Amino acid sequence: MKRNTNSSNKTRRLVLIGALGGISIFLGISGLGLIRLPIFSLTIMHIPVIIGALLEGPIVGIAVGLIFGLFSMYQNITAPGLTSFIFWNPIIALIPRILIGVISYYSFKLLKHKIKNTGICVGISAILGTLTNTVGVLGLTYILYLDRYAQAREISREAVAGTLLTV
């Protein structure tokens, strides 16, 4: 009997999206995915997005990134904090998270032809995916909410600009 590999691939991708999306949500709910600092939070919730993209391609990365972004919106709507308004905006909550998988996958694909060491390619791609999230969220916050963010934190525009642009 001939096995339908296309159906098997779709099933594997769907399972991976569910598993990695679930890990992202677990990291968010448990608090293990966030490191809270006075002015902003660092996250490791993007790591499942990178893993999905590198294992199964950009579609899986996009799907897991979308789950990460939607959960971020949900968290900031249901348990708002001082600067939650930033993540109520789908441009900030979703686009950088979706792009993590795209950038990670295509940078890996490009690098593997230039660099023979797969581990180095994975490392560079993971760094680029991480930077996609960081630069995307902080850059869009700067562009869209600089004054409102400064007011919420009760600090000057210059202090916010310096912080956002140097992180």
What name fits each language-model region?
Residues M1-V167:
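Loop-helix junctions at membrane interfaces
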